[in-house]
Amino acid sequence: MRKTKFWLVLSLIATSLSIFACKKDSTATKNPIPEVSKAKASTKLLNATTVATTDYELIWSDEFNSSGGFDSTKWSYADRGTVAWNKYMTSLPAYASQDGSNLVLRMDNAVVAGDPVAYHAGGVKSMGKFSMTYGKVEVRAKFTQGRGSWPAIWMMPEPATAYGGWPSCGEIDSMEHVNNESVMYHTIHNGSVTNANGGSTASKSATYNTTDYNLYTMIWSPNDIRFYVNNSLQYTYARVSGGGTQQWPFDVPFYLILNQAGGAGWPGAITNADLPFSMQVDYVRVYKLPLFSNGDFESGVIYPWTTWGGGSSVVSTDARTGTKCIRETGGETSIEQYLTGLTPNTTYRFGGYAKVSAAGQSVSIGVKNYGGTAVDATIGTTSYSNNSVTFTTGANNTTATVYFYKPLSGTVYGDDFYLEKL
């Protein structure tokens, strides 16, 4: 929950570092994965501008439909500290409780016996109760505006210092809002993008419905982190090859934080007439990434496949089924997809359909980096043919890379790729 734009933090004074265990400077600113993930099942998954609605397995959630205290098996109070965001955190139900349909996080200037601070505010964290590595997080929430207000939906690593203190440990801010602004912010923090003042160059403002609930979605994969508001993609932070942990500390578990902060750091002083501030959270839902996705390209984009070599594009001609397929042109060309969540010592089949534009050409479907020797199968027909490979993951391997590879010049097409657990 750092402040996101450099110009927003120039006037802020850096103070002590602390974020539970990962020293963050905040003065500135239900069911197992389906065994087969096939073809048309992922139609909506990787649309470039809208969030996925299929192929995700719900693994953790809180609907906040009770009254009184929050579920202590899932959350604990966000502790008060010495940095801006947690300066007024208060571990009392008056500041973090359920109202029958929402988690209500409140901030006011009420007098609390035995706690003589100017303001009291609420927040919760899932640290020690739930954390995740890769997946989709949906939070539906609304909040009030006011001078000095600072609600946020964000994540920090657990263990906290796997890659050092803040910001090297990493931070994912799905939503931050300050004061009366008509925009909210998505931000990434790490040792590469966070400057000395606590601001980040990996930040994006986005409009939102200022008077009602909004759905804030974060999709985190081994390749990138994507932020959506109301199912519309707003910002993507991509992993850089060779960037190391300074650029990508995002391969360890992170836990969730929801808070209504204010009165220090980025938003500045509170105008008491604007109190109380509150953030109402309708639900939090966390989903596991599918093993394999976008095998049919009906989304119209290549993601989460990556490309290298000649030209790779999704086209609306020559599809085997549906209306789209992948086309590779030019010289040596490949598309690849990095898979996570595989089971060690387990056999899978990866396959698909392909055709070449002229006799004598060929294209391969294969898998590598799974704990064994790369294997592939060749297709050289001018009409769609199916081929596949089987592979068994190593004793400690949970990842693999599948590919569609054209070794020479020419044009080939691919469609309806699939992954099966045997």
Curated annotation (Swiss-Prot):
Gene Ontology molecular function, alphabetical: keratan-sulfate endo-1,4-beta-galactosidase activity
Record CDD domains: GH16_laminarinase_like
Enzyme Commission code: 3.2.1.103
GO-annotated biological processes: carbohydrate metabolic process
Signal peptide boundaries: 1-46
Compartments (UniProt record): Secreted
Active-site residue numbers: E171 (nucleophile), E176 (proton donor)
EC main group: hydrolase
Superkingdom: Bacteria
Domain CBM-cenC: 291-406
Catalytic activities: Endohydrolysis of (1->4)-beta-D-galactosidic linkages in keratan sulfate
Keywords annotated in UniProt: Glycosidase, Hydrolase, Secreted, Signal
Domain called GH16: residue spans: 47-292
GO terms for cellular component: extracellular region
UniProt function note: Hydrolyzes internal endo-beta-galactosyl linkages in keratan sulfate and in various neolacto-type glycosphingolipids, producing sulfated and non-sulfated disaccharides, and glucosylceramides respectivly.
Family membership: Belongs to the glycosyl hydrolase 16 family.
Protein name listed in UniProt: Keratan-sulfate endo-1,4-beta-galactosidase
Organism per entry: Sphingobacterium multivorum
Source organism phylogeny: Bacteria, Pseudomonadati, Bacteroidota, Sphingobacteriia, Sphingobacteriales
